[in-house]
Regions:
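Aromatic/pi-system hotspot detector in well-structured domains
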Residues: 12, 19, 114, 126-133, ...
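Hydrophobic alpha-helical transmembrane segments and adjacent interfacial helices
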Residues: 20-24, 44-55, 72-79, 97-111, ...
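Membrane-proximal helix-loop-helix units in multi-pass membrane proteins
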Residues: 62-133
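Cytoplasm-facing juxtamembrane segments at the starts of transmembrane helices
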Residues: 28-41, 81-97, 117-125, 138-160
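Generic local-structure boundary detector
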Residues: 31, 35, 51, 77-79, ...
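Long alpha-helical, hydrophobic tracts
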Residues: 3, 7-9, 14-17, 54-69, ...
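N-terminal topogenic module of multi-pass integral membrane proteins
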Residues: 1-54, 153, 167-182
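Residue-level signal for well-ordered alpha-helical segments
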Residues: 1-4, 57, 111, 115-118
Length: 182
């Protein structure tokens, strides 16, 4: 297995757990503290993976993963310590811009380099995550009543943009990077 793709699969799988758990929490199906602990654990684990990607020369991928990790550190503090979520809401606005840029980057890269055309999927995933973060901004920072929509989008994206592609990467059924060596 190519180490880079395995690391991306690992990160996608872990982030999928967080998306699913956060969605269930927003629907009132789980306790905030237990999902806060999950957010903290995943933030630490994907930060380590991001550092490994950085040492392999994939700093852009490491930065994308680090943006997720920062969200999860903040969510852990909100869920476990009861902090206000407005700051997270404003971070989500910034994150929306970051994920839109990555969506463009991955889609353009996959179009320009046919050997790695599969990275266009990461562009689609980033666009989906940007939508989620934009709705979270409206909900958390501006107080719009979109919590249920955000919860269901978390759950849907947990499967479609994270669990399924993560498992495909981990089981070597998908090779979007064309075998980039690590």
């Amino acid at each position: 297995m190519v180490p880079v793709e395995a690391l991306f699969g690992y990160v996608l799988l872990l982030v999928g757990f967080v998306f699913f758990g956060n969605g269930l929490t927003l629907l009132g199906k789980t306790g905030a503290k237990e999902i806060g602990v999950l957010n903290l654990a995943v933030a630490v684990l994907i930060s380590i993976a991001a550092w490994k990607l950085h040492t392999l020369g994939l700093t852009a991928g490491a930065a994308l993963i680090s943006a997720f990790a920062l969200v999860y550190f903040m969510v852990a503090a909100i869920f476990c310590l009861g902090y206000d979520a407005k700051g997270l809401g404003w971070y989500c606005l910034f994150g929306t811009v970051v994920f839109l840029w990555y969506a463009y980057h991955f889609y353009a890269l996959g179009t320009a380099v046919p050997a790695i055309a599969g990275v266009k999927w990461f562009g689609i995933f980033c666009a989906a995550w940007a939508l989620l973060l934009l709705l979270a901004f409206f909900t958390l920072a501006l107080g719009k009543a979109l919590g249920t929509a955000v919860a269901y989008l978390f759950i849907i994206e947990a499967f479609l943009t994270l669990l399924i592609p993560g498992m495909l990467l981990l089981t070597e059924k998908w090779n979007p990077l064309g075998g980039v060596p690590g």
